[in-house]
Amino acid sequence: MSDFYQDFNKRRTFAIISHPDAGKTTVTEKLLLFGGAIQLAGTVKGRKADRHATSDWMEMEKERGISITTSVMQFIHNQHVINLLDTPGHEDFSEDTYRTLTAVDSALMVIDVAKGVEERTVKLMEVCRLRDTPIMTFINKLDREGREPIDLLDEVESVLGIQCAPITWPVGMGKRFKGIYHRYQDIIYLYQQGSNAKKVEAMQIKGLDNPQLDELIGDSADELREEIELVKGASHEFNLEAYLAGKMTPVYFGSAINNFGIKELLDDFVEYAPGPQPRATQERVVSPHEETFSGFVFKIQANMDPKHRDRIAFVRVCSGSYKKGMKLNHLRIGKEVQISNALTFMAGDRSHTELALAGDIIGLHNHGTIRIGDTFTQGEHLKFTGIPNFAPELFRLVRLRDPLKSKALLKGLIELSEEGATQVFRPLNSNQLILGAVGILQFDVVAHRLKHEYKVDCIYESVNIACARWVYSEDDKAMSEFRTKAYDYLALDGGDMLMYLAPTKVNLTMAEERYPKIKFCATREH
């Protein structure tokens, strides 16, 4: 095993954030291609094409051509181990995506040159902001006509509130796209349309004043020189400290579908992006340098492999190392468990791992005992913080076509809700089952998976619920009185936590005023 593989400082764990259709899945594919993890990139162009994108492996994703679950992919580049967490780009998938961002040390933002900063990117950026996550930016699709690069940088600065430092700069775009200029290497990489699935080394010209540049790209050479002068005066110079503090984003341009501009981005990413960072727990801050193992569960995925009806808990390693067969404490249930078969991932291809260090993601087989937010250590009592659970915003009543399947329905709904994208509620005053989600597409996903994975056919009906809140009180008497008086509005979630299901926003406001000793919470820590 190579030396760098055993050095946690050589780990880079990141996620890609973007608006749907900015080309995130293609960028993911091409990073894997340049990282040597896949020999042939499955283009995402033909949605029904035979070769599906490596990172979209769940059946429904393949049918629809969108990334629904957070895949984890590990590859090696320039003697660094890179863990890429693929977040769903579809506008629906907030919860899973938010939680994924708690498990990374940096992020890559992908922006469509024609569309600029879009609403979904703004939301994801807000989450990164909460933790000052360092962000690199890739402006994609330069092989098409788009907006002026300088205008895009202005938009990123004003809308997202982060300084931009262009590292590479495009030479034209669309039909006039000639290449990119790396401002810090003083090298022009000439554009040639990459055969989609293969790596192509771009032709390089050293120096902006090189006469060879004029020979090869004609008038575009003088235009580039003028633009670079303007950029020097109008934009920020790259500052590593500002980037690591989440205050500045280095910006790269390219065309992922043509494999262009990706290698320059990847080389710099490995050099500048942070390794594993310290993590906060309720008790203290855990440093990645510590020798004893600690980690937290940020995602649970049911039935990753239909051949083995299984559930996998994804654990971010925060300190120490995982070694095959080691014993770990599962703190929430107070049990010591032996972990002999943790998994590492290459999007759906699983292999048993002998070693995982801080920054790595491992998969633990879960037979219903592990939940999102659980902490594993080698004995110390710690609880990692900052892993959110959001109250759903959309609700449906779940009905069975076959009443004899009610046990299988409850099992399916609870197991799927453990993945964290949906939540199931059981009202105290009835036997009904209510499904809550943050995005509308989740209802389709659940119905599809209930049918295919649990053999349960369900239908949805509308239900009179506008919003849901977890309810707590430190005053037992007040809580007991509240339970009695608000009984018809109360339900238990999948983890048996009490929730208030309000038929209208006004009803919720009145309840908050009427019961001042009860806390109504829209989010809770796992």
UniProtKB/Swiss-Prot annotation:
Tell whether Signal is among the UniProt keywords.
no
Binding-site residues, GTP: 18-25, 86-90, 140-143
Q: Tell me which GO cellular component terms the UniProt record holds.
A: cytosol
Function of the molecule: Increases the formation of ribosomal termination complexes and stimulates activities of RF-1 and RF-2. It binds guanine nucleotides and has strong preference for UGA stop codons. It may interact directly with the ribosome. The stimulation of RF-1 and RF-2 is significantly reduced by GTP and GDP, but not by GMP.
Q: Which Pfam families match?
A: EF-G_D2, GTP_EFTU, RF3_C
Q: According to its UniProt record, which protein family does this protein belong to?
A: Belongs to the TRAFAC class translation factor GTPase superfamily. Classic translation factor GTPase family. PrfC subfamily.
- Organism of provenance: Legionella pneumophila subsp. pneumophila (strain Philadelphia 1 / ATCC 33152 / DSM 7513)
Write the protein's name.
Answer: Peptide chain release factor 3
Which InterPro entries does this UniProt record tie to the protein? EF-G-like_DII, EFG_III/V, G_TR_CS, P-loop_NTPase, PrfC, RF3_C, RF3_dom_3_sf, RF3_GTP-bd
**Localization, UniProt:** Cytoplasm
* Domain tr-type G span(s) in chain numbering: 9-277
One GO molecular-function entry: translation release factor activity, codon specific
